[in-house]
Amino acid sequence: MLPPASPFLPASPFIMSFAAPSYAFATPFQTPAASPIRSLMSYAMRPGSISMAGGYPAQELFDIDGLTTASNQVLARLGACLQYSNIDGQASLRAELARLTAERGLACDPDTELAVTGGSQQALALVSRVMLQPGDHAFIESPAFPNSVQALRYTGATVHPVASGPQGIDVDALDEMAARLKPKIVCVVASFSNPCGATISRQRRLRLLELAVKHRFLIVEDDPYGELRFSGEQVPPIAALAEGEARHWAVYISTMSKTMAPALRIGWLVAPAEVRRRCVGAKAADDMASSAWIQEVVAQYLANGRYQQHVPRIRAAYGARCDALAQALHKYLDGRVAFRKPEGGMFFWVRLNGEADATRLLPYAIEQGIVYVPGKAFYADPQQADLNAMRMSFATMNEGLITQGIERLARALDACEANAPVSVSLAA
């Protein structure tokens, strides 16, 4: 039975329609940034699927006991940790991070050169914001992590990719481009880059510093993976190699996301005092401060010595998984793919031989139950994309699953090369 008609409304129902508003979005946000990596997560989460797509650390390797102990210690003695934090970070954590950074070869003043951030992504965004504006130019190695490219683009600056290979960024190309375009920032992941797994040699890092002084640009080194070295010689951060005037042109960024846990959202930057001071001001406008409680927990964890015990354990686990992926590629795809085994980090950059296209192969791979990220997702300029390439992460799977995943990929490649029907349809 219908309710009685309201005396305040007309007897005949009607529908009001409104045109969608036309918002005056800022130029960098007028076209929402698509994430080809996130778009693959629904396939990666299918039951029975083996995902090499994500850049996540292995959840089973998180040191829950160590973090629980540190958290209980902090809450028992420090109720103030539930208050607001200093904008630049808790003094206890800045001191611990300065010690950790010094162990990596880079000495810094925790009060004037180091600041705590919400992961390394916020650190890059802050440096970009205080250095760049519309009309400026920024360089980034190519291929590169898409979110890093977005952090630069959201400032309104023009972002230029600089070719990168197995030894990292092409310094000769950088020199020529910098002479023409006068960049204010050059961004690199110098150790075990995402997506290529490449490491820049000491000699090339020194050359980067020479070019920074010559062209007066700021080197921003993002170092999420440096602790995860399985083989080869450790290379100091770029800023640690800087001498004289070069010390004014290098910023170091790092994070606890890959070694402790990403949910902590603890990163930090080490920068010349004037750059650091402005980044802290930008952070105040951004989020006021990072969580004091989480900062104190991480500081306590470091002070307890658990970090020094934990990193070798995850390094060994990831090293074994890296070996397993290399062996599986040799066993099941020998002669059909090319790759360089990384000395650390989480990623392989695998190239299909011949005319194979990693994007065309992907639906066949998903159908077989294996997911990766096509290489074109990592190019700031799609016209430069290597269509044969794919990024594969070995971090979140044990050796058995890695082997099974590559066996599936071989079957997918067989089907793709035979132009077999495929049930999976991906959006363009």
Go through the PLM ranges and name each one.
Residues S17, E367, Q383-A428:
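PLP-dependent enzyme catalytic core of the Aspartate aminotransferase-like
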Residues P28-G119, L126, A303-N304, V371, ...:
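N-terminal small-domain helix-loop-helix segment of the aminotransferase-like
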Residues A80-R216, G226-E245, Y318, G400, ...:
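Conserved core of the PLP fold type I
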Residues E243-A316, A418:
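Conserved core segment of the aminotransferase class I/II
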Residues R276, V280, V350-R391, E399, ...:
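Conserved C-terminal alpha-helix-loop-beta "cap" of PLP-dependent enzymes
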Residues A299, P312, A316-A326, A338-R351, ...:
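Conserved glycine-rich beta-strand-loop-beta hairpin in the small C-terminal domain of fold type I
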